Amino acid sequence: MRETSVHIVSLGCPKNLIDSEVMAALLEQAGCRIVSGPEEADILLLNTCAFILPAREESIDEIFRLAEWKKAGKCRHLIVTGCLPQRYGAELAAELPEVDLFLGISEVPNIADHLRVLMEGKHSEKNRVIVTNPLFLMDAGHPRLLSTPPYSAYLKIAEGCSNRCSYCIIPRLRGKARSRPIEDILREAEDLVDRGVRELILVAQDTTAYGRDLEGKPTLALLLRELAGLNTLAWIRILYTYPTGLTDELLNVIANQDRICSYLDVPIQHIDDDILAAMKRRGDSHLIRNSLERARAVIPDLALRTSLITGFPGETPAKFHRLIAFVQETRFDHLGVFPYSPEEGTPAEKLPRQVSQRTKETRRNLLMEEQAVISHEINQTLVGSLQEVLIEGPSSSPDYPMIGRCRRQAPDIDGLTYVKGGKQPFLPGSLVQCRIVAADDYDLFAEVISSPD
């Protein structure tokens, strides 16, 4: 396969992105050349998402887009991997003859072997779809070709999910929760830091469930203490926590370790107790409120992000107004809202009192409008404050020529910090002390007060 060129498109969440990075590195080790555009590629590889309807639609659209390159260019084969074939492999094969090979989630470590067989013409129609039980769990021995900027990387600490939310298909796609041993995670983290990574972003389906399946039941708090000992690492950020997992031990570790950002992503989905029960979420509204209040009390200057679902079956106007009142009261720093997507095979799909798509979208928009006001007000309170900013690169603004993120901002999902002053340009990955001089709904504007570290 030497000099075979491969173009990889990765859709969905950061956890899926890591799978794509592993496949890219394995293909490169096998002699392939990873290229940035489909027009350069012999092989097109699409790693898909199938979590909700919009994700499936995006995946199908991308298959058709890449298939056009296959028809028109030098591309020889189109491979589709990930959650979509894991869920619909046989159906996809019947409907999409343009695709040469469909691979499920457990085939990530075998990608080079599959490509070799495909290029040798040994793949038959019978094994055009290869989907097995989702048992793959990456370890530090799996290489990664980072697709994120070199100063920031995601670190997958577990795979799968043992929560049984009534609306969610993830346990069927990814299997039960499987945690990586602390020693293995530390090996990968050390390698990433040696490669220049300054920000590690911990991800899993539920990061606070980390270790429950391992002997000795190590906790996320213990893992964080170990990671915080990596000397040249600047920031550790935690995504995908669960309200019931915000233990005092975890909150105190975040509060007392300088390298851990005062930032928590806590998807709560709803606040109405009837809706939470129908969702089969662990914990009620009292637990959610208590968890968030404790987090803010323990961690100074905590930035809170959450995700919500609108239009879940049974969400009456009164229940929705309870949700919007909670958002107004709690004042999250960052918020994502998703209209409920009925997923085939989930208990929620069969619930009575389904809500119209139009109502779901309207309620989502109302929440986001309210959040824009809240975010603007919170950002205004930051004007005059000192913030450490991780420089990402040049911006398009002549007034603020550099762009970055402060500890309150996760990549891709939160706002940005625009930077002026100092001896610019700064190298991407530099940490700069800044004073916030202005703010809008989602972004901050800062002036450098000290040189990069």
Swiss-Prot record:
Cited SUPFAM superfamilies: Radical SAM enzymes
Keyword terms of this UniProt record: 4Fe-4S, Cytoplasm, Iron, Iron-sulfur, Metal-binding, S-adenosyl-L-methionine, Transferase
Entry's Gene Ontology molecular function annotations: 4 iron, 4 sulfur cluster binding; aspartic acid methylthiotransferase activity; metal ion binding; protein methylthiotransferase activity
InterPro entries, per the entry: Elp3/MiaA/NifB-like_rSAM (IPR006638), Methylthiotransferase (IPR005839), Methylthiotransferase_CS (IPR020612), Methylthiotransferase_N (IPR013848), Methylthiotransferase_N_sf (IPR038135), NA-bd_OB-fold (IPR012340), Ribosomal_uS12_MeSTrfase_RimO (IPR005840), rSAM (IPR007197)
Positions that bind [4Fe-4S] cluster 2: 161, 165, 168
Pfam families listed in its UniProt record: Radical_SAM (PF04055), TRAM_2 (PF18693), UPF0004 (PF00919)
Domain TRAM: residue ranges: 380-450
Domain MTTase N-terminal: 4-120
Cofactor(s), by name: [4Fe-4S] cluster
Annotated localization: Cytoplasm
Catalytic activity: L-aspartate(89)-[ribosomal protein uS12]-hydrogen + (sulfur carrier)-SH + AH2 + 2 S-adenosyl-L-methionine = 3-methylsulfanyl-L-aspartate(89)-[ribosomal protein uS12]-hydrogen + (sulfur carrier)-H + 5'-deoxyadenosine + L-methionine + A + S-adenosyl-L-homocysteine + 2 H(+)
Biological process per Gene Ontology, one example term: tRNA modification
Enzyme Commission number, as recorded: 2.8.4.4
Segments forming domain Radical SAM core: 147-377
Transmembrane portions of the chain: none
GO cellular component, one term: cytosol
Role noted for this protein: Catalyzes the methylthiolation of an aspartic acid residue of ribosomal protein uS12.
Protein's name in the database: Ribosomal protein uS12 methylthiotransferase RimO
Native source species: Syntrophus aciditrophicus (strain SB)
